[in-house]
Amino acid sequence: MTKIVAVVGGKHSGKTTIIQHIARELKSRGYNVGSVKEMPNVRWIDAPEKETWKHGEAGVEIVVGAATNETVLFIKRKLALNEIAAFFKGFDYILLEGFENERAVAKIIAAKDASEVRTFCDGLAIAVSGIIVESKEEVEKASTFNVPILNCKVEVNKLADLVEQKALPLFPNLAHCKECGYGTCHELAKAIIAGVADLRRCPLYGRTNVVLEVNGQVVPLKFFPSLFIERTLIGMVSSLNGVNHVTEIKLIVRKA
């Protein structure tokens, strides 16, 4: 299960430095780690003088730059976070820089002062770090938010511990699900981070005996649809010649 944590904050607050230190620490613990940087003020990553740019101008939807030591994928549209996360199948953690508007992602606040902590404190914060640690006065002010304030350079082990304990997988954010007993995925995420709820409350992660993917995205199943699919498929497959005891079924349907 891939888990995600976002490092959020204002400009020059230390976001990238925090990501670097946490990534190294998680890697040293044997995890597969990926990262995504949000660039809301940048329209194009590719450059007009590059051949890859010219490929895109010809109208192709995806351009791949295959170099000796790295491969770059240019997709000619903005992707939602769940689409981006699909590229990280098999990874343990995805570290996001930015994405403060995500409503069900655990967050580390990078701040220069206590006022910035207040700005980004939305009930999803698991830690505060960044430039603020250089000022005892600002640290004292920010301590009122009851979120651990850690120096990423000398306390990265504690930050990584919090990531291990508090990072969440990507929630489905279904508007009318409420199967977990909370109003939204945002409310459930806050409750999990606060320690008053469990990830198993989410139908997507609480019942793993039936997993439905549509177009590469996992679809949460409530109890009765899950039970119906499970019993129907097992009943049909068990009747086929050559099938003995069924322990797992993989079915792929492609629309013609």
State the predicted function of each range:
Residues 164-176, 194:
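Immediate flanking context of iron-sulfur cluster ligation sites
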Residues 98-138:
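Conserved C-terminal guanine-recognition region of P-loop GTPase G domains, centered on the G4
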Residues 21-76:
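N-terminal phosphate/diphosphate-binding loop that engages ATP/GTP or pyrophosphate donors
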Residues 174-190, 203-204:
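Local cysteine-cluster metal-coordination motifs and their immediate loop/turn environment
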Residues 1-41, 138, 172:
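Walker A (P-loop) phosphate-binding motif
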Residues 192-207:
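Non-heme iron-sulfur electron-transfer modules
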